[in-house]
């Protein structure tokens, strides 16, 4: 729900005509758009809640991934940390000195949509041990992570290839970690509510229209 105390402000220009943006956005919402669908409760995640039971009691997790493969889950964890009773460590670069090395085993979420991200592969080879439990999230095609999952006999979750990194937080990439954090992932799927909120919808149109106006007229900060 959107708090009534939130004031939607924008940087609109009075010269902007937003009717075309409104028309295109209305058409887009009515179309069968898989990326938009991933933001709603209609999207079906490619993981089974029953299969995650063996991980639910675990308290320590590592999320190994670069860019959009980990930033969404990291944002959720940072924002809702006061509600989360588990520890999540995010390995999103090649500096791993801050990781607790004394711990004998971890539950690893290894995420790369292409399955061939070099930094992720390097960290995986440096960090994971035989006794670790691993879940790998990647596209359903021949790649390094799928081969690794077979070798480790690890759980594999296939990520839909039509959802890019910056849009992936509400797909398996962000929702699987959120589920393991003990959060209700349905609470994140608010698209259907937002598009019915006139204030949100009108401000979205206004902001997009203004952005296009400034770009077309080469007005940059």
Model regions and ranges:
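Generic structural motif recognizing short loop/turn segments at the entrances and edges of beta-strands
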Residues: 1-4, 32-35, 85-87, 152-153, ...
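Structured N-terminal alpha/beta-domain signature
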Residues: 12, 28-30, 35, 40, ...
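Acidic catalytic cores of enzymes that act on phosphate-bearing nucleotides/polynucleotides
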Residues: 41-44, 51, 183-189, 197-221
């Amino acid at each position: 729900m959107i708090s009534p105390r939130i004031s939607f402000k924008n940087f609109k220009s009075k010269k902007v005509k937003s009717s075309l943006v409104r028309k295109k956005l209305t058409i887009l919402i009515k179309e069968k758009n898989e990326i938009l669908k991933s933001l709603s409760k209609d999207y079906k995640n490619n993981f089974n809640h029953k299969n995650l039971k063996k991980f639910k009691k675990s308290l320590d997790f590592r999320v190994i991934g670069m860019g959009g493969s980990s930033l969404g889950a990291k944002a959720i964890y940072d924002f809702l940390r006061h509600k989360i009773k588990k520890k999540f460590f995010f390995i999103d670069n090649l500096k791993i000195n801050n990781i607790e090395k004394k711990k004998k085993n971890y539950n690893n979420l290894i995420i790369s949509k292409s399955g061939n991200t070099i930094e992720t592969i390097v960290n995986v080879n440096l960090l994971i041990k035989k006794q670790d439990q691993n879940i790998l999230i990647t596209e359903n095609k021949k790649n390094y992570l799928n081969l690794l999952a077979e070798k480790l006999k690890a759980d594999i979750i296939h990520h839909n290839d039509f959802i890019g990194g910056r849009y992936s937080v509400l797909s398996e990439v962000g929702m699987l970690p959120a589920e393991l954090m003990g959060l209700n992932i349905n609470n994140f799927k608010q698209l259907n509510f937002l598009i019915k909120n006139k204030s949100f919808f009108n401000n979205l149109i206004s902001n997009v229209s203004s952005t296009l106006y400034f770009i077309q007229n080469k007005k940059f900060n």
